[in-house]
């Protein structure tokens, strides 16, 4: 009798647990249930810009490998600047492919979802194609041959692609940027902190110059770059006031910028500081080095952990 009751209890709880475990969690957001409205597309796209800021907010891949910088007032030069990269400290492309994955999601579902305004749909798709081209151009210049992934990864049943030749990667960059140019409904700017048709022409110009010089594109690529450069300059002009170039107001010289809100930069005491991983902090002097300067109010300086690890090189200043 006791054994029978025990068996019944075990069966009851086992079946109950099974039913509980089989319940589909209604609060879980996945690709299967997220993409429904145009707000889902535009909201997701805004999040991509956040990831883009993190990916390019570094000197590691570009300036550190060139001759633009020299040592600044404080230590902290990267291993890339010191030409001391090894298998243990070298960077990787995970963050960039994560960014590409998000763009692939917007492109896939943005094409499926209906928008009340066709221009808004085209602009969202254009921005996604622009960011994907921008990211692949970054990868191409850093690693050369890289895998080309044009579909989002929505299953663990995938085959990892091999690295594609640089010429093929460049073709994909230009395909994306040309499609972005076609899709943008405006010829000018809606928001200079987001991609636009002039920004797409500027990216195309940069890519064509790389193709001409590094990938043996020759005069044909240079000629196409000249045409694209003229189109990129529509609506912008040189500012007679040099200081305005560094203003947060996106002046008349700006074609594309990434937005950083000052309120993001607070220490634990609530004091406004510049985060040490902000791009500009590597070039600015610490406040303690300029506090006694007669023109301290005219000097851009950093607080807290930020420091001027770099200074413009003599070669750069001689330009």
Predicted feature descriptions by range:
Residues 78, 234-319:
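Elongated scaffold/linker segments in the mid-to-C-terminal portions of large proteins
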Residues 140-142, 147, 188, 210-219:
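Short coil/turn linking the two alpha-helices of tandem helical-hairpin repeats
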Residues 1-26:
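Bacterial Sec-dependent N-terminal signal peptides
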Residues 17-61:
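Membrane-proximal, proline-rich intrinsically disordered regions
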């Amino acid at each position: 009798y006791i054994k029978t009751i025990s068996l019944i209890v075990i069966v009851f709880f086992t079946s109950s647990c099974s039913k509980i475990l089989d319940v589909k969690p209604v609060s879980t957001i996945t690709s299967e249930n997220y993409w429904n409205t145009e707000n889902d597309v535009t909201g997701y796209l805004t999040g991509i810009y956040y990831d883009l800021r993190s990916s390019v907010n570094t000197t590691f891949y570009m300036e550190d490998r060139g001759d633009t910088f020299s040592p600044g007032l404080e230590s902290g030069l990267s291993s890339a600047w010191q030409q001391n990269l090894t298998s243990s400290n070298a960077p990787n492309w995970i963050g960039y492919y994560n960014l590409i994955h998000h763009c692939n999601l917007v492109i896939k579902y943005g094409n499926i979802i209906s928008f009340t305004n066709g221009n808004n749909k085209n602009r969202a798709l254009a921005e996604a194609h622009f960011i994907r081209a921008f990211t692949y151009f970054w990868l191409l210049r850093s690693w050369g041959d890289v895998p080309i992934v044009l579909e989002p990864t929505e299953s663990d049943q995938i085959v990892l692609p091999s690295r594609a030749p640089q010429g093929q990667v460049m073709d994909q960059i230009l395909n994306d940027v040309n499609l972005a140019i076609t899709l943008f409904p405006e010829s000018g700017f809606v928001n200079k902190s987001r991609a636009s048709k002039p920004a797409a022409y500027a990216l195309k110009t940069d890519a064509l110059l790389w193709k001409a010089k590094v990938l043996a594109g020759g005069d044909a690529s240079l000629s196409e770059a000249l045409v694209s450069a003229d189109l990129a300059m529509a609506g912008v002009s040189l500012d007679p006031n040099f200081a305005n170039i560094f203003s947060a107001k996106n002046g008349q010289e700006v074609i594309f910028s990434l937005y950083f809100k000052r309120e993001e930069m607070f220490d634990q005491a609530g004091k406004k500081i510049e985060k040490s991983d902000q791009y500009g902090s590597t070039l600015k002097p610490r406040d303690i080095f300029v506090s006694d300067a007669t023109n301290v109010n005219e000097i851009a300086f950093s607080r807290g952990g930020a420091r001027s690890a770099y200074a413009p090189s003599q070669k750069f200043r001689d330009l």
